[in-house]
């Protein structure tokens, strides 16, 4: 599945979960993915989100995509212990 199709499917979650940004990173963002590679996402929200809700979102996204999804609650700062080499913004209210 290509990034455009992933973005189209994931945009269906925006309103339901008050998502303000969906950012793809990892192998799918830099083009080194295999067909079965996981989907690494930074997800930002307009409201506070519990770990239970994050888990529910992850499960629903995996079911919708048919791929493993890893979610990082954004925004990410320089102090966070995660390295993001390339980002592909799939959705943003800030455009």
PLM region descriptions:
Residues 39-44:
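Amphipathic, hydrophobic secondary-structure cores in small proteins
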Residues 1-23, 29-35, 46-95:
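Catalytic core of pol beta-like nucleotidyltransferases
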């Amino acid at each position: 599945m290509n990034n455009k199709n992933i973005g189209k499917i994931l945009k269906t979650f925006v309103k339901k979960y008050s998502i303000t940004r969906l950012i793809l990173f990892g192998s799918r963002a830099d083009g080194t993915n295999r067909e079965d590679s996981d989907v690494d996402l930074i997800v930002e929200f307009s409201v506070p989100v519990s770990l239970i809700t994050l888990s529910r979102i992850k499960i629903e996204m995996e079911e919708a995509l048919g791929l493993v999804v890893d979610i990082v609650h954004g925004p990410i700062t320089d102090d966070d212990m995660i390295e993001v080499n390339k980002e592909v913004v799939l959705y943003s209210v800030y455009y």
